[in-house]
Amino acid sequence: MFTDDIFLKSLRNNIVLAIVLPVVTLTLSFALASLITVGGSMRGQTRGLKASGFYRTVSFFPYVIPAIVIGIMWSQIYDPSNGLLNGILTALGFEMFESFPWLGDERTAMAATIFVIVWSMVGFYMVLFVAAIKDVPAETFEAARIDGAGRFRIAISITLPLIRDNVQTAWIYLGILALDAFVYMAALNPGGGPNNSTLVMAQQLFTTAFTKGQFGLACAMGVVLAAVTLLFSALVFTVNRLLGGKDDGGR
């Protein structure tokens, strides 16, 4: 199994996803949550943007759409000939994108796929962080403002440490999603993309078991996938502990 170049590439793709997907998704989610909750006027009482409920609803909407529907929808948007994305870019004067294969080019296939997953998940984690930030006493932000801290300093030095445990939980969930990601990958690139550039272990496991009929090898792949998932979770807990997060149920 570990001498199979295709399996090793799928493992590498999973590791890339497990690193990039949580970082991008949580960064955007935290930035949007901070903007909505404490990103309003710096005058008077600390407050978020007006109509924040509307922004939360709109951002959360993609999360309630089934993953397979999202995959099919974006595969049509990315379509080289009749896709909406190429149509818009061409209309704006970018003629080089007239028939650009976003999912068919090895240079862009993984990035285009990650964008779709981030788009579908960022709203959920934004709402999660909004709820966590609202639990922080308003006096904490007021004191920071009186001391002269700006929005960015408040977000990084005050807000983020106080919701560290929420970030840890979100990171683990996103990591598990990245290590699976079967539905998104199968819908966007059923064959694993150009030169297997988007192939993940779950896809390789499915093909090995149900197309090739090699169930023993597929079980071994499943064990490797489970081990990688446990290792990822342990790594997140360890990093959080080293950075000063709570341990033993918040002790």
Regions found by a protein language model. Give the residues of each.
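A structural signal for multi-pass alpha-helical bundles of membrane permease subunits
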Residues: 1-251
